[in-house]
């Protein structure tokens, strides 16, 4: 009775995922049918988790040679440090291992300084290498050292400021979340003749470090893990029905194949050549019929009679209902049970 609380609620059998132009960044994910009200419940919960709770990587601080604080300007650089830091915050990063990691950028002008100019470090990948960080004039030079770490959600620059940080190390606002945008809508949908069900549509954009489909999967796992504490009972165990062999009009031992009997090679080959497959086929043969089998002699006959006698069987028996229509299936089930 208690299981009906959750077992009898309708739930979607699978998700319908439609990738966008860039399948690593954009996707529309549809779940249907859902019980009335569950579209809003799940959509709102998943959206909040997608935006706030997934792990990602981001720059936490930057050191620029010759710069003491963010309200400075750099000779030969068109942007001031405040603008440079705003651009740095937009660098999308994917990091497989744990942080923190150091990354260095060094470039001479003239020209634009891009995120892709940052030197590669092990398992750290820049996902938007064409992002412009700043612009250098002729003869200008810039060197920056970045600190990259992992985390979740949004962390303000003040929280990234270490007490023992050296002079010139500028903390940066860190947006760790790999999900940039999430929207959802709930519509009516049909299941059979019933229209009173929900259809949940999620539209997700990530920074490329995580696919939208994986982002939803991880978010659902987080929600599942948080809800486990509210389940204060053990689910009653289901009694699994044990499949049984149906009532047979004959001894089920007749479904055993003759090649499983301990016969000599000569006797086994004679039965095989005469297309005798099951014991049920064999016992309906008379002694005279067996002796007419090519290469089958009295010695083989006596051997077979002895083996059958040990099973309480003999040649020349009449078997009602043999052979059954589904003999191969019955033989397999017999093998599993006996």
Swiss-Prot record:
<dbReference type="InterPro" id="IPR011260">
    <property type="entry name" value="RNAP_asu_C"/>
</dbReference>
<dbReference type="InterPro" id="IPR036643">
    <property type="entry name" value="RNApol_insert_sf"/>
</dbReference>
<comment type="function">
    <text>DNA-dependent RNA polymerase catalyzes the transcription of DNA into RNA using the four ribonucleoside triphosphates as substrates.</text>
</comment>
<dbReference type="GO" id="GO:0006351">
    <property type="term" value="P:DNA-templated transcription"/>
</dbReference>
<keyword id="KW-0804">Transcription</keyword>
<dbReference type="GO" id="GO:0005737">
    <property type="term" value="C:cytoplasm"/>
</dbReference>
<comment type="similarity">
    <text>Belongs to the RNA polymerase alpha chain family.</text>
</comment>
<dbReference type="GO" id="GO:0000428">
    <property type="term" value="C:DNA-directed RNA polymerase complex"/>
</dbReference>
<dbReference type="InterPro" id="IPR011263">
    <property type="entry name" value="DNA-dir_RNA_pol_RpoA/D/Rpb3"/>
</dbReference>
<dbReference type="InterPro" id="IPR011773">
    <property type="entry name" value="DNA-dir_RpoA"/>
</dbReference>
<keyword id="KW-0808">Transferase</keyword>
<dbReference type="GO" id="GO:0003677">
    <property type="term" value="F:DNA binding"/>
</dbReference>
<dbReference type="Pfam" id="PF01193">
    <property type="entry name" value="RNA_pol_L"/>
</dbReference>
<dbReference type="GO" id="GO:0046983">
    <property type="term" value="F:protein dimerization activity"/>
</dbReference>
<dbReference type="InterPro" id="IPR036603">
    <property type="entry name" value="RBP11-like"/>
</dbReference>
<feature type="region of interest" description="Alpha C-terminal domain (alpha-CTD)">
    <location>
        <begin position="250"/>
        <end position="338"/>
    </location>
</feature>
<dbReference type="InterPro" id="IPR011262">
    <property type="entry name" value="DNA-dir_RNA_pol_insert"/>
</dbReference>
<feature type="region of interest" description="Alpha N-terminal domain (alpha-NTD)">
    <location>
        <begin position="1"/>
        <end position="234"/>
    </location>
</feature>
<keyword id="KW-0548">Nucleotidyltransferase</keyword>
<dbReference type="Pfam" id="PF03118">
    <property type="entry name" value="RNA_pol_A_CTD"/>
</dbReference>
<dbReference type="GO" id="GO:0003899">
    <property type="term" value="F:DNA-directed RNA polymerase activity"/>
</dbReference>
<protein>
    <recommendedName>
        <fullName>DNA-directed RNA polymerase subunit alpha</fullName>
        <ecNumber>2.7.7.6</ecNumber>
    </recommendedName>
</protein>
<keyword id="KW-0240">DNA-directed RNA polymerase</keyword>
<dbReference type="Pfam" id="PF01000">
    <property type="entry name" value="RNA_pol_A_bac"/>
</dbReference>
<comment type="subunit">
    <text>Homodimer. The RNAP catalytic core consists of 2 alpha, 1 beta, 1 beta' and 1 omega subunit. When a sigma factor is associated with the core the holoenzyme is formed, which can initiate transcription.</text>
</comment>
